[in-house]
């Protein structure tokens, strides 16, 4: 979803003349929506199973990353305007963008507690979910829509920060927060702390030069996931 939103913003930059940053939110929303639609179509025949959705998402992320790299390699001067945003940065976030994103986030996060039962039962497996009367396909689609909207809103504000979204739930689980709502709350808080820490390091480590928070979080996250893989293999 974040890669689709990023590609939508970059494509808008090439199509809209002049100062196109006012179209950032609509372009990112369209990119995220198109990405979500493709994932739903690709995984629909399998009953929207997590594995099929994961594979479809990985394939789309790879495709969008390749297209973004091609646009960067083209040498177009317009890419320089948005290169920092693609790297995941708070530098270009304006007060109006933060306010708009904050309002959307509050509305979406208010829906999360209503889905607590779904998120508690789904990890137990499809058979268990059906046994308690849960409709698997509509439930998975609804949760995917909610997650996609939350991801797109964050991406349009500060750019793609995939590793923060990957690290935070694992860290929260390692801290002992395994029940659904405590895990979600702690994941959000942990992700915020990681972002603030990466942003602070990016501004201070090579001062007066600045490193985007997305690059630093990836630098931190890659060794962390290697550590997790080694730990699980043992």
Language-model features and meaning:
Residues 1-234:
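Alpha-helical transmembrane segments in inner-membrane proteins
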């Amino acid at each position: 979803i974040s890669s689709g939103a990023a590609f939508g913003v970059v494509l808008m930059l090439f199509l809209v003349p002049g100062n196109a940053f006012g179209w950032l939110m609509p372009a990112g929303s369209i990119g995220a929506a198109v990405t979500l639609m493709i994932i739903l179509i690709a995984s629909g025949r399998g009953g929207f199973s997590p594995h099929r959705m994961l594979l479809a998402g990985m394939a789309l992320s790879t495709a969008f990353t390749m297209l973004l790299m091609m646009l960067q390699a083209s040498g177009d001067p317009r890419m320089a305007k948005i290169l920092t945003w693609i790297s995941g940065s708070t530098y270009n976030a304006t007060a109006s963008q933060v306010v708009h994103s904050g309002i959307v986030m509050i509305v979406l996060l208010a829906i999360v507690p209503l889905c607590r039962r779904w998120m508690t039962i789904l990890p137990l497996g499809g058979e268990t979910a059906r046994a308690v009367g849960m409709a698997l396909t509509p439930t998975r689609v609804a949760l995917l829509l909610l997650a996609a909207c939350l991801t797109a809103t964050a991406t349009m504000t500060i750019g793609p920060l995939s590793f923060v979204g990957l690290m935070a739930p694992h860290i929260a689980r390692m801290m002992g927060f395994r029940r659904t709502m405590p895990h979600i709350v702690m994941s959000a808080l942990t992700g915020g702390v990681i972002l603030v820490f990466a942003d602070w390091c990016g501004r201070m480590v090579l001062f007066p030069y600045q490193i985007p928070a997305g690059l630093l979080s990836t630098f931190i996250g890659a060794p962390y996931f290697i550590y997790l893989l080694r730990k699980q293999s043992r």
